[in-house]
């Protein structure tokens, strides 16, 4: 069965929210798209990020853009925490210049860095919730 791609508005909403909450201010939400794929033969891949390379940007006269693809067979069975970590991981591949290129795994997009961002996110959410309860 060939891979099929479907729009994923719920993933897009989560990605936009994570980019804001994680303070990834270099990410331009209107140029980050999200799809769900079905039929992939990948066994270890949970999600992928695709960039619109400079040559295509120039030829098509388009701005830098990224597409985050989640592989439904694996991603959908994960816990909510692991799904968030996965999306953070993919967002961390987007460089500060939002140029269409990628940051590498080695030295930046590593588990410990993803976990550090996720831990800060959880801490910020808890503080926000506590503040909300305090002022009610």
Go through the PLM ranges and name each one.
Residues 1-81, 97-136:
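Metalloprotease/metallohydrolase-associated module, dominated by Zn2+-dependent proteases
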Residues 83-97:
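Active-site recognition of the HExxH zinc-binding catalytic motif
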């Amino acid at each position: 069965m060939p891979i099929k791609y479907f729009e994923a508005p719920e993933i897009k909403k989560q990605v936009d929210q994570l980019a804001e909450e994680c303070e990834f201010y270099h990410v331009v939400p209107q140029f980050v798209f999200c799809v769900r794929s079905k039929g992939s033969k990948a066994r270890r891949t949970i999600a992928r990020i695709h960039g619109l390379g400079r040559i295509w940007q120039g030829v098509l006269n388009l701005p830098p853009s990224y597409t985050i693809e989640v592989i439904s067979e694996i991603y959908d069975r994960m816990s909510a925490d692991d799904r968030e970590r996965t999306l953070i991981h993919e967002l961390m591949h987007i460089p500060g210049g939002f140029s269409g290129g990628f940051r590498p795994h080695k030295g930046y997009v590593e588990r410990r860095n993803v976990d550090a961002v996720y831990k800060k996110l959880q801490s910020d959410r808890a503080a926000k919730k506590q503040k909300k309860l305090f002022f009610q």
